[in-house]
Amino acid sequence: MGEHRPFDEKQRKAIEAFCENYNVVVYVNHLSNYHGKYSIQGNLLVACGGMKKLHPDILITIGGQTGDYPLYGALNGLSDMEHWRVAEDGALVDTYSRLTKVFECPDYFFFNRLAGVHLCGHSYYEKWIQLEEMLNRNIQLPFSNLYVAQQLYKEIPSCSIVNYAILNSLRCWNYFPLDPSIQGYANVAAFGIDGCNSMLIGESMNTDELCFIITGDLAFFYDMNALGIRHIKKNVRIILINNGGGAEFKIMTDAWKEDVHVADFISANGHNGSAKGWAENCGFIYFSATDESSFEKCKVNLISRSDKPIILEVFTYVDNEKKANDLILASNRISSKTDNIKALIKNVLGEKGTDVLKKIIIT
């Protein structure tokens, strides 16, 4: 399920009835806004290699974009899989290069029509759950966006609305499950940076529940003028992860770091800017954290009611952002038989020996 408005009871029952009759799992993330039976937030599981053991025969997609790069990488590499798209617009959106059928209808209509009366086993869902329960999210992480997500995901008040100025924030927070009453949104079509603060503030006008956004320094400063909007409500909460300029670009291009020095192409790299002056001038309560101790002191204020909107600026280092992501993936890595054989060869031959073997095989 991609980005979707919260499902009503009719939609949820149709999906659950469909699931009862087929051996399926409903893969969701925070943007899906679905928490029905047979659903699983499997982002961390897939990022750790879980799809090697969970190969689907048919993929049915509903909703908009997912912003889920681990899922895209895993599914795009599968050869013997059908992709069915269910959408009222009937558009040919072949995200995973496996599109075979398009059902031009509402998702409720599709699931309701295909829901039968013959119940079946659910071994596929049980396999997902078995692997999911093996994951360890409670590992020691360096101070980073991922650390903030790890410390806050159980603390966000029920019925809150959480926004993600993707890509880094969406990935980090998708590793951790939130309370089912919490709604999630992101500007995925604009890849997060366009108007994320403005969206949050507009959204907060329609509710009295706490409205959060987890954003990076580049996305925040790109839309900083939104903080100057008059009459911003006191339910606004901004968590600004300031890593000094474009950590996500460096994480995503790590495999090329020897050939391309990405920092040379990030105009805001090393900007040394802070939101403090602007936030306070716009009437926000401002807190900052530079380490675990100072973050712990600010955390309670962030998730509590207040008389003014709040911004928490968390100063991190680019290296820690990458280390944190590498750590949580390495700690939960799911290996196939092929991976184990490759690891054995590498241990025996070493890096140089493995490179020589690759050249021999290629030639």
Predicted regions and their residues:
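Short acidic/His/Gly/Ser-rich catalytic and metal-binding motifs that mark active-site loops
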Residues: G36, L131, R171-N174, A247-K250
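Glycine-rich, acidic loop regions that bind phosphate or pyrophosphate groups
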Residues: Y27-I129, R230-H231, I238, G244, ...
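Alpha-helical scaffold segments in soluble metabolic enzymes
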Residues: A17, G73, R113, Q150-E155, ...
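Thiamine diphosphate
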Residues: Y175-T363
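Structural motif
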Residues: I58, I161, L210-F212
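Phosphate/pyrophosphate-binding active-site segments
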Residues: N76-N168, E292-T363
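Glycine-rich, anion-gripping cofactor-binding loops and their flanking helix/strand elements
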Residues: G2-W84, D179-T207, F221-M224, T290-S293
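Short glycine-rich anion-binding loops that position phosphate/pyrophosphate groups of nucleotides
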Residues: E3-P6, L31-S32, G63-G67, D89, ...
